[in-house]
């Protein structure tokens, strides 16, 4: 698979098969992803691979906090408002997701259960917790670099026939995850990457995706 094909075909997977991903395959992907660029070659990312009983424990804890109505206090502040054009895009993908599942807007129970499924990482058998050191002098640049390796990892996974979903809900309740990770007291949990084999027949993995026209985001200066 060439790079262009991987970029165009990769999508967020929201239903995974239960099959475990071989550890050596995950290791290969991570070994290649570490060649992602970073500012000054600092490579500030730190990645935890969570599987097996540890992942089961995390999913239970994560959903438990959601069910209890525990306030979300993520390490990295999440957006509270958007410019109107971004808000429209965010709302549109939410509508597409629910429509693919046949969940009506007024179906409170259906929406709640889908949220719980999301907090279980769509049943992915592997979670990669993407972190940076909180002692970094520039958190913003470290996060930029973390985004670079995250995208690289997702493209490499797609090339191997795997699916990914970059998930904020994996780090909404940091203690649910941090309690399972060694030496994580000085880490900022920025995002989770759900990893596994995609259920290619699931409607939620096949709805039409959209991207804004090039003219909306690119300005030529000559």
Which functions belong to the PLM regions below?
Residues 1-222:
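Acidic, surface-exposed loops and disordered segments
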